[in-house]
Structures are given as structure tokens and as C-alpha cells.
């Protein structure tokens, strides 16, 4: 009679036709797919992080270089040295010569040669050109320093984002390791739950890879977390 009831339940689909040996096969596949998804996510984070860092790397030295240049121009001594170099440059000689010619031509046209006004205009050429050059240099240094500072800030932001995302991945990987450790399996029967957790954690750490120092550190952390379960 019991057999008849059992057969009826199987025919109605209330029970499987053949008893399953357990969910080990499906669970193993699920764990494998989950680990592959974690690896893909970690690899993607590594690629994005490395791309950003490498793209910004050429610009980061500008910050140190041109902040130092600005510091040099912030003192009277530094400004004096810079202006002295400028006054001895061909650029200054050309601009000063052009300015003198224009002033003298205008004074000659108006009959003002030898006047105090003309003399004052000629004497103002050097300090005017010097201050214009110095102001332009400081603006250029500031702009270049800002480019470097922006690159450094971009790297810092990328590092923070990378750390946050990899922290989430490591937590998910640790949860996966815990689930694998707590799931009955042939491996656990053989070596025990604690050792299984350690193996799972070490495997996930390997999946993370070490394409960046961050990835290596987080991968090591995943192995440590996995060994706790």
C-alpha cells in the first residue's frame, strides 16, 4: 500500500521519479559561478584602477615641480633672480627694443623728444616688461601645478573607489567562503569544516590576482577571512 501511495505521488509530480543523491552537483556549480563572478569583478576593478593610474601618472610630477617654482617666486630674492635672468634674455631685448622704438617714434611725431614724459616712458619699459613677465610666469606655474594637483586628486579618488569596491568584493568572497565551509560536502567530510574554509579563502584570494599592490593585499585579506570559517 505504501508503495502505491509513493508511486501515485511520483506520477502526479509531487515527488521526483528517482531520489536525488543530494544537491552537491548543483551547489558546486553555483559556487563555481559565484567564484568566477567574483574574479571577473575583481579583474575589472584592477583594470579600471590601473588604467586611471597610468593615464594620470604623466601629469602628477607637475604638481611637485611647479609648486616648487611658485615657492621660488614667492620671495623677493627668488623674484630678483628670475627677473635678472629675464632681463638678460633675448625675449626681453626684443620687446624692450620694440617698446623704445615705438615711444621714440611717437615722441618725435609730437615733438616730445627729450621731454620728461618721454624719459619717464622709456625708463618704465624695463619694470613694466619685467612685472608682466613675472606675473605671466606665476600664472603659468599655477596652471601647471593645478594640472598636477588635479592628477594627484584623481589618483586619490580612484584609489578610494578601488578600495571601497574591492572591500565589497572581499566581503562577498568571504561570505561565499563561509557558505562553502558550512555546506556538507565530500571535502568537508574528509578534512573538516575549518580546513575547508581555509581552502576556500585561499582559492578566492588567488582568484583576485595581484595585478596591483591593492589587489595583492585584498587577496591576502580574503584568504585570511576564508580561513576563519
From Swiss-Prot:
GO terms for cellular component: virion component. It comes from the Viruses. Residues 1-20 form a propeptide. Keywords: Late protein, Viral genome ejection through host cell envelope, Viral penetration into host cytoplasm, Virion, Virus entry into host cell. Its main location: virion. It is found in: Virion. One of its GO terms (biological process) is symbiont genome ejection through host cell envelope, short tail mechanism. Belongs to the podoviruses gp7 family. Interacts with the internal virion protein gp20; this interaction forms a tube-like structure that may allow DNA ejection through the host membranes. Inner capsid protein that plays a role in viral DNA ejection into the host cell. Assembles into an extracellular trans-envelope channel completed by the internal virion proteins gp7 and probably gp16. This channel allows the delivery of the viral genome into the cell cytoplasm. Displays membrane-association properties, may therefore form a simple channel spanning the outer membrane. This is Internal virion protein gp7. It comes from Salmonella phage P22 (Bacteriophage P22).
Amino acid at each position: 500500500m505504501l508503495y502505491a501511495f509513493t508511486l501515485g505521488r511520483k506520477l502526479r509530480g509531487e515527488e521526483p521519479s528517482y531520489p536525488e543523491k543530494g544537491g552537491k552537483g548543483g551547489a558546486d556549480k553555483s559556487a563555481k559561478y559565484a567564484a568566477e563572478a567574483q574574479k571577473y569583478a575583481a579583474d575589472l576593478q584592477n583594470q579600471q584602477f590601473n588604467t586611471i593610474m597610468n593615464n594620470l601618472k604623466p601629469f602628477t610630477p607637475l604638481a611637485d615641480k611647479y609648486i616648487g617654482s611658485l615657492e621660488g617666486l614667492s620671495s623677493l630674492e627668488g623674484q630678483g633672480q628670475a627677473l635678472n635672468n629675464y632681463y638678460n634674455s633675448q625675449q626681453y631685448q626684443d620687446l624692450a627694443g620694440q617698446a623704445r622704438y615705438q615711444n621714440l617714434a611717437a615722441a618725435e611725431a609730437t615733438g616730445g623728444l627729450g621731454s620728461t614724459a618721454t624719459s619717464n616712458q622709456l625708463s618704465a619699459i624695463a619694470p613694466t616688461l619685467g612685472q608682466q613677465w613675472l606675473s605671466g610666469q606665476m600664472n603659468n606655474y599655477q596652471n601647471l601645478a593645478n594640472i598636477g594637483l588635479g592628477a594627484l586628486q584623481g589618483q586619490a579618488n580612484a584609489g578610494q573607489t578601488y578600495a571601497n569596491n574591492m572591500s565589497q568584493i572581499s566581503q562577498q568572497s568571504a561570505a561565499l567562503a563561509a557558505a562553502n565551509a558550512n555546506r556538507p560536502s565530500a571535502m568537508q567530510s574528509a578534512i573538516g569544516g575549518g580546513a575547508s574554509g581555509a581552502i576556500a579563502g585561499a582559492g578566492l584570494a588567488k582568484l583576485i590576482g595581484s595585478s596591483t599592490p591593492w589587489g595583492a593585499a585584498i587577496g591576502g585579506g580574503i584568504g585570511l577571512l576564508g580561513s576563519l570559517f
